[in-house]
């Protein structure tokens, strides 16, 4: 059996009310924005999907601080104006908390496109990597990742098909 690693832990502020997203296998899912602070102090607004039963267990209001654990998921949204990859966090647990912001992700996947090494306008070395992270039932999430500095240099040399672990 294949070892599957796709885990994310986020602490952030609820930035909007959950709204109905979709139903899958009889489960209703709701989407909401979570404002997550980086180490630099910059705030990112991340889309989170949560099943209705999880939201019912954790009643939260706008501005509340939530600790969310789950997986990073992706799907191709086929709109009339074109396709685009939609990335979100699928919440598995969610609690109200007052802890310091603790944000971590762990992925194990396969490089599915040739890495692209480049320098930013500010001179930083980065490498764009598309990682295919397996999940059960022969499915995969395709996650674009940006690697920095020495890690970017090393990843630029990796061929398609290489298994890569990121934390």
Mark where each language-model region is:
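Single-stranded nucleic acid-binding surfaces, predominantly the OB-fold ssDNA-binding core
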Residues: 1-167
